[in-house]
Amino acid sequence: PVKALINNAGLGKMAFLEQLSVADLRLVMDVNFMSHAIITKSFLPLLKKQGSGDIVFTGSEAALKGSRQGSIYCASKFAIRGFAQALRDECGKSGVRVSILNPGAVRTPFFDELNFEPGADPENAVEADDVAAALMTVIEARPGTVLEEISISPQSHVWQRKK
């Protein structure tokens, strides 16, 4: 059996909307939303048939509040959040649990191609291990319990421009 489907693909294109190409818009929506929807559609019949399993999406703090120069990124993460909420309702009686993790800035290669990054102090970003711990809490929850949504935030939101 499949215990969990973890949807964790994502990329960021941060700019004012008019500075982004149509190809940029499609890329962000395809990676951040469509890839999750397509793989989930592929696995859902199996999970429902076995009557158990977790579907976990990596959302973002950007799924909770729009931000300047984040229009398409925020839209893609809002889409994931709405998708997870609707899917949770669709799967309610099947034994399949649906959750979303909304991390803030995570110190990962996500920022490699962006012109900003979290501040250097440890409290300016969460670590990948923090997100992994939240994920394990979700999938190890007692059967019948759904941790619908978890936000994982740095203690202090400090951003710095790259030189």
Region roles according to the model:
Residues 40, 76:
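Active-site helix of classical SDR
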Residues 100, 118-160:
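C-terminal helical subdomain
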Residues 60:
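Residue(s) in the substrate-gating loop at a strand-loop-helix junction
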Residues 8-13:
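Conserved NAD(P)H cofactor-binding loop of Rossmann-fold oxidoreductase domains
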